Amino acid sequence: MSIAERITALRALMADRGYDVYMVPTDDNHQSEYVGEHFKARAFITGFTGSAGTAVITKDEAGLWTDGRYFVQAAQQLEGSGVKLFKMGEPGVPTVEEYIANVIPENGTLGFDGRVVAMGEGQALVEAVAPKHAKINYSEDLIDLIWEDRPALSEKPAFALGEEYTGESTASKLARIREAMKEHGATVHVIAALDDVCWTTNLRGDDIEYFPLLLSYAVITMDDMKLYIDERKLTD
């Protein structure tokens, strides 16, 4: 499908499910700066392949917000697509939140995949649409429903790095983390950032091109640590 056809398909889904505005950010479930192929939903719906940007689709308009690093690239890749470029930080250019607040109708509905939106950003969106008494539905990934050949989540194996490369054992790192937890009165520490999980566990992966990161989460208590990971990645 062309970009125009993808946007048309998304709008049909939006109408069927009652969305007035649908937002597609760049992020993955871990708020990574660079994401694996499965998470490149914004690139799929706009054709813009830069590492930063947010797409917003309405019944009549499609827009892409990105920063100054990508103005030239975005203008080239969006040409003829029907997607309007919003140059972030430029005079007179609304933020994503300002734009949504303006275009969403009274009692309308804003949608996005809540798994890839940080809490702070989500709260900003709640506040943006509140004056219009609009609702937010973050339970559906509409892009997944139209992306027929979407790459699967990476199943590439994890691998461990020895202390000669990491400089410190996982046990030592956990001991230091637990000391910090005590200082802050915490009994449970949840790690969602991929680089933090990899540093703590001394594990690496190949789930994001050019970055040795591993799709995973970790939960540390005073007694143990649990690693949440696709078990197909583990060989031992």
Where in the sequence are the language-model features?
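Terminal domain-start leader segments
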Residues: 1-236
